[in-house]
Structures are given as structure tokens and as C-alpha cells.
UniProtKB/Swiss-Prot annotation:
This is Cytochrome b. Keywords: Electron transport, Heme, Iron, Membrane, Metal-binding, Mitochondrion, Mitochondrion inner membrane, Respiratory chain, Transmembrane, Transmembrane helix, Transport, Ubiquinone. The cytochrome bc1 complex contains 11 subunits: 3 respiratory subunits (MT-CYB, CYC1 and UQCRFS1), 2 core proteins (UQCRC1 and UQCRC2) and 6 low-molecular weight proteins (UQCRH/QCR6, UQCRB/QCR7, UQCRQ/QCR8, UQCR10/QCR9, UQCR11/QCR10 and a cleavage product of UQCRFS1). This cytochrome bc1 complex then forms a dimer. It comes from Artibeus aztecus (Aztec fruit-eating bat). The gene is MT-CYB. It is a multi-pass membrane protein. Its cofactor is heme b. Heme b b566 binds at residues 97, 196. Pfam families: Cytochrom_B_C (PF00032), Cytochrome_B (PF00033).
Amino acid sequence: MTNIRKTHPLLKIINSSFVDLPAPSSLSSWWNFGSLLGVCLGVQILTGLFLAMHYTSDTATAFNSVTHICRDVNYGWLLRYLHANGASMFFICLYLHVGRGLFYGSYTYSETWNIGILLLFAVMATAFMGYVLPWGQMSFWGATVITNLLSAIPYIGTDLLQWIWGGFSVDKSTLTRFFAFHFLLPFIVTALVMVHLLFLHETGSNNPTGIPSDPDMIPFHPYYTIKDILGFLVMLTALATLVLFSPDLLGDPDNYIPANPLTTPPHIKPEWYFLFAYAILRSIPNKLGGVLALVMSILILAIVPILHTSKQRSMMFRPLSQCLFWLLVAILFTLTWIGGQPVEHPYIIIGQTASVLYFLIILFFMPMVSMVENYLLKW
């Protein structure tokens, strides 16, 4: 008799995705981040759902409703801090997942990679709108500054901005629509995740060597299910430690001051996970140029497959490319640091140098070094 998991219309989809899925035998821990992102998304949707039951999206009561959640709702403080720090864990896993894709050449699966870029944009939009909801000082001014960038778009910028605001400034209608979109987007993200997995399972997973692994496959369960569960435990332990010991470590103290349109905080900055892009935005003295650089800092991932000039897929056996990759990582850390600093000397020039290097490495140095490595292979 055939097992029900292989015949049942619903169970066989789950079976072919998580049980009998053939997987390369050499996958390292860098392949854990996909499943960790799934757990992060689940945690965010669950905690967000319970928070939404107590939150009110009105400028008069939003800040107080968050205070009420933390003080009066059973384990409301836990829900709030799990949700806020869960977003940080989400982005840590996201950036490591993208970094893994860049290092091991996973971007050659173009459909999976492009859906991944769409997912990155969707998650960033969700996180930005979520940061506005507590209606603290940094929420309000962050929303004002970032949405204001749309006014740099020629001809339609100002009209588009007022349409998004629902008025002439960030106000009640802006908060209400941001809450609606913040609630809706995670479900769109979930649908995109399914498409991402669909395309991934069409080709099968890449592996650290970058060499086709068809002759050497193992079933996903029990080998990688156990490995993923270990990853869950490590990540959830880190999240629990952050939430229970230092919940405000990654937040901004200004957000504990209710939003006031009449006083501007000394340093307006987004959450830490957007600082690298914010630093690139601030490095360009022109408004439209800054906005284009900001968008391109993420969208540049879409042209990485076109710029792949190496004869090898993975960087595992390419030491020169590895040096450039880790230099790129160092530059991203530098940009993240600069994004949190005030706009003054020497931070301005450091930010501009790092921004130029970021684009140069991806667009010019990496393809060039790959060609040099191809030449060295002939020796």
C-alpha cells in the first residue's frame, strides 16, 4: 500500500517539498537561513496578529495603545519586544541568506534570485511601515523624511507624495493606511515565499562547491530537518536572550517620546538594518541622485547574474574573489556605522568613499577579478 503522504493531494506537495525532496549531501550551515527566515516570518505574523488585537491606528491613541500593550496586556511586553527584535533577526537572516547566494553563485538560478529580490523589497517596505506604527518621535520623523524622498521624482513626485500621505503631511490618514499595509504585506510575502520555493524546487538546491550534485543526493528528511531544527534552536535562543535581557538594545530611545511635529530629533535615522542604504542616500548631495543610489543599492543584486564572468559558479575555489567579497562585507559594515552617525566631517567623506567602493566592487572589480581567475586557470 502506498503511503498517504505520497498520494494525498495536499500531503504530497508537503512531502515533495520537505520530506522526500532530494538535497545535495554537502550543504553547509549557510543553507539553514532559508528555513530560519520561514520561522522568523511565522513568529512575526503570530506576534503581529496578537499585537494588532490591542493596537489602535489613530494619532491620538497609537502611542498610548503600545504603552497599554506593554503594561496591561498579559505578556504584551513579550509580544511587543518579540515582534520588534524578531524584525532584527529577520534582517540578520535575510542579509546572511543574500550573502550566501552571492558567495556560492546561487544567483545563477535567475527566477529564484529575482523573486528573492522582490521579497527583500517587500520585507523592507513592511519593516519601514511597522516602524511608523508606535508613533514615537523617530516613527514620525523617519516616516516624514523617507516618504519625502518621493518628492524627488520629476513631475509626479509631489502629487504622489500627497496621495501616499493622504494630506499635506504625515498625519492620521498616513498612520491608518500604513497599519493596513503593514498588516497585509506579510501575507503577500508568504505568497512570494511559496513562489520562491516553487522555482527553487524546479532546479534543486545549489551546493558549496557550485558543481552539479545530481549523482550525490540525500532525502531532505531526516538529515536536513534535524539540521534545520538545530538552527531554529540557536536562532530562537539568540532572540529570547535579546528580548529578555536587552530588548531596547537595537531600538532608538527617541521612540519613547510621543510624536511631535513641532520638535525635530537631533539625529533622524531609521532602524539599524536600513542604515547602510541610508548612508548611501546621504552620501550624494543631490536629492534625486540620492534616491536613485538608495534604490540601486538593493536593485544592483538583479544585475549580479549578468556580471558573472567566472567559469566557476561558487567562490569556494576562487581566493581572489573571496578577498573582494569580504571587502564588500566590511564596506557594508562601514556604511551601517556611518548611517548612524551625524552628517559632519569625517563621517561624510568616509560614507562617500564606502558608497563608491560598494558600487565599484560589484559592478567592476568582481567581474574583472573573475576574468583574471579564468586566465590563471589556464596556467
